[in-house]
UniProtKB/Swiss-Prot annotation:
This is Tryptophan synthase alpha chain. It comes from the Bacteria. It comes from Burkholderia lata (strain ATCC 17760 / DSM 23089 / LMG 22485 / NCIMB 9086 / R18194 / 383). Pathway: Amino-acid biosynthesis; L-tryptophan biosynthesis; L-tryptophan from chorismate: step 5/5. Tetramer of two alpha and two beta chains.
Amino acid sequence: MNRIQQTFAALAEQGRKGLIPFITAGDPDPAKTVEFMHALAEGGADVIELGVPFSDPMADGPVIQRSSERALARGVTLKSVLADVKRFRETDPKTPVVLMGYANPIERMGVDTFAAEAQAAGVDGVLVVDYPPEEAGVFAEKMRAAQIDPIFLLAPTSTDERIADVGKIASGYVYYVSLKGVTGAGNLDVSSIAGKIPAIKSRVPVPVGVGFGIRDAETARAVAEVSDAVVIGSRLVQLLESAAPEGAAAALKTFIAELRAALDGAGKTAR
């Protein structure tokens, strides 16, 4: 088993739910990214999603769009993000890291080159927002050949056919987008999520993480009751946007620890 599979197997054995925080690499300061990754892990993150900044992040709301713009303005590239993962791996060989972003930077690097360099850096999974499953078969095969999990999005609008397509090629976990629209938008309806998850789990043989719109421990706990993992991004990016630079890592760790405690409560309830 790879790191993602080991992590979810351990969570299932313990009756706990996964916590998957997202931050944008290089924001607000490229020199702080690895420190922030360690803060997430120390706070209780099970998997870290590291955003690769892109100039046209179509699935992201204004918070993460601003974050991408700041990172790009500071010279962050896919190559520098891979270097961050490699540095993180020097002192954390355990916490899975998933790169989340768009196809263009990967295609510019070359898929084969990306697969080799991501594997060498210690990347465990990759979620490419604009690779639909019906067009991603070759990409998924190349990722798996490099021991990298190809991770896919599902949404409230996903048809049974789309869910089945994802089930055929996904590994690691799938990311269920709990709201229509862009990241950070709207209010969650947990009962609606609960109604969708069984249909996904019946067709997809990997854990289901739920994200978009999760902003606090209470919401995270409610979502954890009906999913395998909770993904939180925009709220963390906002936290880093507003925190004093010297206290940002500590604030991140504290917030993640609060979410971890809430999810562990959900896990106990679910057993």
